A protein has these predicted regions:
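Residue-level signal for well-ordered alpha-helical segments
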Residues: 15, 24, 54-56, 63-68, ...
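Sec-dependent N-terminal signal peptides
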Residues: 4-19
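Non-cytosolic coordination micro-motifs
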Residues: 20-57, 93-196
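Mid-chain, structured segments of secreted extracytoplasmic proteins
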Residues: 62-108
Length: 196
């Protein structure tokens, strides 16, 4: 009897530990590993590293050009500068009309809701446009309850923003699809807190 209990406990502990180490995925790639490891995987998916633009933006971000869900996008990969660990990936559909931005948002929102149907959704508005946050949970969360960040693989934000470089009508818009891995985001934020 002791062996059965010990075996069951060991199996449950192994499953629990495995669940705690899972990462959110972008295009089937876990948001984990060093920036160089992640870059090698994303390049295999057809993304092209844009060195010039990467050097022009802030430290801890690399920029790629590619295609995401049938759309040309700019891909921003965020990583911790000291340990080079990836924690966030954002695809941006740039410079499109308001009508097209609304259509792209609706299409991607529906696809994400279908893929993550058992997860917690939080709808809101950003810049008078709809926005959606999906908490990709380790297990199903009751829809009435607020999500607990520790119980999630991470979160995915999708929203529309007006392009700030165009000041005259007709305005140009961008659609953002922003993936945050919970485990590595926590590590990155804890390192920042330790510096204070």
């Amino acid at each position: 009897m002791k062996r059965i209990v010990l075996f069951t406990f060991t199996m449950l502990l192994g499953i629990f530990c495995y669940a705690q180490s899972e990462h959110l995925k972008f295009s089937g790639i876990p948001i984990d590993g060093t920036i160089n490891q992640f870059q090698a995987k994303i390049v295999q998916k057809g993304y092209v590293y844009n060195k010039l633009y990467s050097e022009a933006i802030s430290n801890g971000v690399r920029y790629f050009d590619g295609t995401f869900v049938g759309n040309k996008v700019g891909l921003y990969v965020y990583y911790d500068e000291q340990i080079k660990k990836v924690y966030r990936v954002k695809a941006v559909i740039n410079n499109i009309s308001e009508e097209l931005a609304d259509q792209k948002y609706q299409m991607i929102q529906q696809l994400l809701q279908r893929k993550y149907e058992d997860c917690y959704f939080q709808e809101d508005k950003k810049e008078n446009k709809p926005s959606l946050t999906i908490y990709a949970s380790r297990y199903e969360l009751p829809s009435e309850e607020e999500p607990i960040w520790k119980e999630c693989f991470g979160r995915i934000d999708i929203f529309i923003s007006q392009n700030e470089t165009i000041y005259n009508y007709p305005y140009i818009y961008n659609v953002h699809i922003d993936y945050w891995d919970q485990i590595n985001t926590d590590k990155h934020e804890n390192k920042l807190l330790d510096e204070l």
